[in-house]
Amino acid sequence: MRSLSILGSTGSIGLSTLDVVRQHPEQFTITGLAEGHDVGMLVKQIREFNPRLVSVRNADAAAELASLLGNEKPEIFYGIEGAATVAAADGADMVVSAIVGAAGLVPTISAIKAGKNIALANKETMVVAGRLVTDLARQHKVTIIPVDSEHSAIYQSLLGHRHEDVLRLILTASGGPFLNTSAEELREVTLEQALKHPKWTMGAKITIDSATLMNKGLEVIEAHWLFDMPAHKIGVVVHPQSIIHSMVEYIDGCVMAQLGMPDMRAPIAYAIAYPERCPSGIERLDLPKIGSLSFQEPDPGRFPCLRLAYESLEAGRTCPAVLNAANEIAVAAFLDKRIGFTDIADTVDKTMQAHEAYTPVSLEEYLEADRWAREMAKGLVERA
């Protein structure tokens, strides 16, 4: 029996994780849940999974939750500190880190310092502070199992092979809803169009990141830290069918790939059951039914966010943290219909150009770069 705490339990990854857990009551229990936006959903989760402690976004939400639950309720915490408390709590063997954005960094680090193995769905944790996180994981003998489908595919394709035998990692990208949209048409893209991903069902923020290809850029940075691979050995190929989730090419010319239907429950099940496997509930892969698989190069001219991510990784220091923070602000502004689709990349680019990078050592120094970039990007959005 493995006990889990889930950070971001009411989001897309959290709901999918609980769906896998629901299928295997003999294999998984829930110690803690943390959520940010849906107290009503959290109430249902508490009644079904009976966690010992939970966290919500703020004091008002905590009071609302306590009122809804009545006398029989778990310990209730709130804010980033509350999520960190849930992450580090005794009783959990593994923490599923699925809070969206840089807000997941502090709770994930708390879990690592408490010696919890991590099922990592929050790629921003590695983007913002990859060196710090990997150093802490090594220090506390913590295993980080990626939940992103691409990194899960690479993780599985690397097992049993030597690091020095790897020629390169190949991340696949669906291309998003605008794969064949012209640069001129991209300037007129609506929010509703951008939220219609052709293959994956995800939250709003990651869906927009997929449309701009920033999601793939963030995944390149995450892969660098997870697999100790330099930027020039991490490639991206567009694969619209989203059946091959990523590949590893070895020095002998052999390529290992992981295939499956595009359903996040598969990499989630792999991560939370590791090193065993368990049924995930996804549709079975039927290659004759799919018929053919296609591939093409990404277009950096139409999708500059991918280029910006590579540039931030090459520059290092605080640049990836600034890239991520500026993107979070720009995407939020697009979701609020305050800026256009192509303004997202422009905001990120201008924020990065204004930044004087430095080498962070402490968590606070990483967070300071994050705060600076958010303020800069907010100013750019207001003037857009």
Curated annotation (Swiss-Prot):
It comes from the Bacteria. 1-deoxy-D-xylulose 5-phosphate binds at K123, S149, E150, S174, H197, S210, N215, K216, E219. One of its GO terms (biological process) is isopentenyl diphosphate biosynthetic process, methylerythritol 4-phosphate pathway involved in terpenoid biosynthetic process. It catalyses: 2-C-methyl-D-erythritol 4-phosphate + NADP(+) = 1-deoxy-D-xylulose 5-phosphate + NADPH + H(+). InterPro entries: DXP_reductoisomerase, DXP_reductoisomerase_C, DXP_reductoisomerase_N, DXPR_C, DXPR_C_sf, NAD(P)-bd_dom_sf. The keyword NADP applies. Mn(2+) binds at D148, E150, E219. Its EC number is 1.1.1.267. Keywords: Isoprene biosynthesis, Manganese, Metal-binding, NADP, Oxidoreductase. Pathway: Isoprenoid biosynthesis; isopentenyl diphosphate biosynthesis via DXP pathway; isopentenyl diphosphate from 1-deoxy-D-xylulose 5-phosphate: step 1/6. Gene3D superfamilies: 1.10.1740.10, NAD(P)-binding Rossmann-like Domain. Pfam families: DXP_redisom_C, DXP_reductoisom, DXPR_C. One of its GO terms (molecular function) is manganese ion binding. Its cofactor is Mg(2+); Mn(2+). NADPH binds at T10, G11, S12, I13, G36, N122, E124, G203. Catalyzes the NADPH-dependent rearrangement and reduction of 1-deoxy-D-xylulose-5-phosphate (DXP) to 2-C-methyl-D-erythritol 4-phosphate (MEP). NCBIfam families: Dxr, PRK12464.1. Belongs to the DXR family. This is 1-deoxy-D-xylulose 5-phosphate reductoisomerase.
